[in-house]
Structure formats: structure tokens, C-alpha cells
């Protein structure tokens, strides 16, 4: 819809930061010497694809494609949204399916079938902060894990394709779609492999908790907005207390899952987070586990409070032991979910 396109463009109105990645990444290269193909030439070609010198800026011509698969809210959705369950019903659902955070911490698995489309209104009335936080994490955790699993699957497919000398038309079409999705020109493999990566679960949970007050904010309740992303032209919620002339709003989403996907796509494409992606790529290159407490240092531009925002996120991660969830994967309950592992 027109509203969705306006929302899409609004995410990229922040000033661009012309910071380049200056570290090469070492990947194992598999080159098959075919008849008539010069081995050295083929090796050099693959080296150029895999070992770039910098991540390029987002292609402005492709900005509209970045959020094309995300279900933003529009007035057409009024009255057609999925059911909002109350807190008691959600808690009973989790109990019936034996879904609790203690078990998740132990097994490192979460059932993504426990997906909730909207936060319960009653979460604001839960007096116990411990109980409120637990319910919030139970609701948001499966959404983050599932979206990360999809990115991980795409990343695996990307490297499988790059390891081949000759690609099928289906593979070429897949690559073309991913270049669009990540705001890049066709053939920019280096930038694609840097951008196509996961966001640590602990970091995403901490940001969602901070931006929504553990699910109690008006933006989260009315617009399924877990990460406070702004829009200047699209459908959104106007923050209270802002100047009348202020044009920005907080973007609304049809369901919570759409907010998670938009957040990940934003961190993976916006020029403000190029240093975040650089550090993440370095951790990958060194075969390290993604460290949210290091990566969070590169999110000072996510909020106007800068370093203070970073300090708050670190505190949330540590106090709530959120890094326990960084290794959590999708529980294989069906053939569909098995493919995400």
C-alpha cells in the first residue's frame, strides 16, 4: 500500500555516516578446476567476491525493497487484526504447552508455535515486575529466535551458492531478491554477507524491554511497536509532548513479529549501524560467539541519549541474565521448523 511505502522510506531519513569497513575477512575458499577454466583466474574471481574492502552504502534506488516483506499497519487493517488474548489466557497457553524460561535456559530450545501477535493489555497491571518481565520475555523470545533462524538459513544458503562456480537460474533469482532486500546493488556479495546476519537475542530483548517499558508503552500496546522505530510520513502513533510541528511518529505494525523483522532489517541496512555490522563481522571472522555486550557499544545512534542508552541496555542484559538466551534455537516440532535449525 502507499502507506507502507511511505513508512519504508521514512526509516532512511537519518543522516548517512560515511564509515567504511577496513578489515578483510578470511573465508575458506572451495574452487573446483573445470576443463577450460584457468584455476588461478577462478581463484582470483572468488577472492574478490568473498574478500571485499568495505561495506557499500545502501542503494537509494532499492530502499523501497528493504521493508517490502514487512506487515506494516494501515487503516485497511482496522478491525481485521488477529485476536488479542488477555494475560491470563496467554499464561495458561504457556502452561499447557510446558513453556517456561527455566526450561528454555536448560534445553536451549523454544517452541515458535507459542507466537503471540499482540501484547496483552493487562501486562501494564501486573504489579510484580518479575512476573511482568517473565511474561514479556516469553512473548517476545520466540519471535526473535524465529527471525534469527530465518536469517541464519539465508546466510547458509548464501555461502553455499558462493562456493559454486556456476549457479542455476533459481540461485541467481534468489540472490537478486536478497540484494534488493538488503538495499544493495546486484553483485555486491561482500556487503551482503556482512548485512545478512543475526542480532543477538539478548540485545534484541534488551532493546525491546527498554523501548516498551517491558511491554507497557502506548506504542507497544496500540501499534505492536517493540523497538520504537520512527516514521515521518507513514501510519504511526504521535508521541505525547512533542511539538505540534514535529512530523515524526512511531511506526505501527500489524503484528509483533513484523516489528521484530523491521528492527533486524533496520540494524542490518541503515548507515547509522555500519560500525555495529563491522564489529559483528569481525567476531564472525574470528569464529567468536556474537557478544551483545560488545556489539551494544555501537548502538549509540539508536537513541538521542547515546552512551546513556548503551549503559541502560547493558544493565538490562546483565540484571536479567539475557545472554542465557543467545544460544537458544528453534524447537523441531515439525518439518517446517526443522528446516530453520
PLM regions: where:
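Catalytic cores of secreted/periplasmic lytic hydrolases that degrade extracellular macromolecules
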Residues: 1-206, 210-341
